[in-house]
């Protein structure tokens, strides 16, 4: 994009040292969910950094999640990569994002790259973590939207359908507005 548009800038920041400091300060290795909590902290450090630069430049932070990620499986960190001001592609299925990218002339290596959240110190992909590809999850999401249930499928289709439903249920709290405790009027005075 930088080569095509004069108003596009990029900065490379190595946040590893900052993350290591956070990890040293807060990590409780004996806790069962320590690894996931640290991975989510890495995502939130990225968000903090993006908002720092957005604030410096009076910009908004744009999300990169598509409909399958954001509303199908909820595969993002709350107040991390999900902490954005606008979500320009959140109403598009992954296949639609790829089609638009092709139309825009985006490099095919980017279009076909295996999605990864980059939160771990290894090469695991989103598919490794979820147990299904985005093509499979998109299929399952469409089937669910069409009123299908687990009993309509067998084999891998049933497995993928259940993966989508399981992730969706576990991550539903990310997909709905923050609950507000409504205080009765007689208690406010």
Which residue stretches match the model-derived regions?
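ATP/NTP-dependent adenylation/nucleotidyl-transfer catalytic domains that generate, transfer
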Residues: 1-18, 24-41, 48-68, 72-189
